[in-house]
Design a protein with these regions (language model features):
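Generic detector of well-ordered alpha-helical packing
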Residues: 50, 54, 73, 89-92, ...
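Small-residue (primarily alanine) positions within well-ordered alpha-helices
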Residues: 12, 16-19, 118, 219, ...
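An extended, acidic
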Residues: 148-263
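N-terminal subdomain of lithium-sensitive/metallo-dependent phosphomonoesterases centered on the IMPase/IPPase/PAP
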Residues: 1-90, 258
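Short loop segments at secondary-structure junctions
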Residues: 110-114, 124, 133-135, 141-142, ...
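Short gly/ser/thr-rich secondary-structure transition/capping motifs
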Residues: 66-73, 142-143, 227-229
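Residue-level signal for inorganic ion chemistry
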Residues: 23, 49, 60, 93, ...
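DPxDG-like acidic metal-binding loop motif
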Residues: 79-137, 156-158
Length: 263
């Protein structure tokens, strides 16, 4: 199977552009409503989520009709090519309905072995983080820059992010907190933007649990192209979701993984 860098990247950018156009009219709108997808807890979905995924699916229908699609809002559509586009139209809908610009559009092009292309796009700020076999770059208000993870060697110097303070189950929270006790700084509530910052060399670790494939495949594509590592908490592949450890480099990954494995 070959990767056509030019055309696949063009399609991915067109999808991200379409999602931006669909989402931004809804952001910080006073009359925006959210439905709860859970009977217990709160997992919101809005008209913006659905409009963005539909816009991306329309792009794929024009340019990649033989590829499969897996989107958070409209599920899976089988393809014939052996490739699948994995979409989260708004990762961080809780942040979206709260008006914080930490949410993003996640796009991945994947095979059964995992992502070969990833995008994390923040429409309101105007930043786009892209990873592919051709490299990793970000574009934004200040131009274009190469993405490269940093080389922090010690947990004592590391910056750690997660989205929810509880992380997941009590055991998962305990594992996260065991790492957090060793790092220099821990921050919460960043949604997918934390992974983008890791790829950009601002963050050393992101540790989460309970993820779906569409929550992590886009970030994997970006982080790995920028030189980082993304695994589960046992060191295995993370592209199917679950417990995720994203790290800037092999040393900091090994240090965090050693703690998580022991919990």
């Amino acid at each position: 199977m070959t990767f056509d860098a030019l055309t696949d990247l063009q399609v991915a950018h067109e999808m991200a552009d379409a999602a931006r156009a669909a989402i931004l009219p809804f952001f910080r709108r006073a009359d925006l409503t959210a439905e709860n997808k859970l009977t217990e807890g709160f997992d919101p979905v809005t008209a913006a989520d659905r409009a963005a995924e539909q816009a991306m699916r329309e792009v794929l229908g024009r340019h990649r009709p033989d590829d499969g699609i897996w989107g958070e809002e409209f599920g899976q559509s089988a393809g014939q090519s052996g490739r699948q586009w994995v979409l989260d139209p708004i990762d961080g809908t809780r942040g979206f309905i709260s008006g914080t610009p930490t949410w993003g559009v996640l796009i991945a092009l994947s095979t059964e072995d995992g992502p070969i292309l990833g995008i994390v796009d923040q429409p309101y700020i105007g930043e786009r983080f892209v990873g592919s076999p051709e490299g990793a770059v970000m574009t934004g208000p200040h131009g274009v820059a190469e993405l490269k993870t940093r080389d922090t060697q010690s947990l004592a110097d590391a910056v750690l992010f997660t989205t929810f303070p509880e992380v997941g189950s009590p055991d998962e929270r305990a594992g996260f907190e065991a790492v957090a006790r060793q790092v220099r700084l821990t921050r919460y509530g960043m949604d997918c933007y934390a992974y983008a910052l890791l790829a950009a060399g601002q963050v050393d670790l992101v540790i989460e649990a309970g993820l779906n494939a569409y929550d992590i495949q886009g970030p994997i594509g970006v982080i790995e192209a920028a030189g980082g590592i993304v695994t589960d908490w046992q060191g295995g592949p993370a592209h199917n979701g679950g417990r995720v450890l994203a790290a800037a480099n092999a040393d900091i990954h090994a240090a965090a993984l050693n703690i998580l494995k022991s919990k």
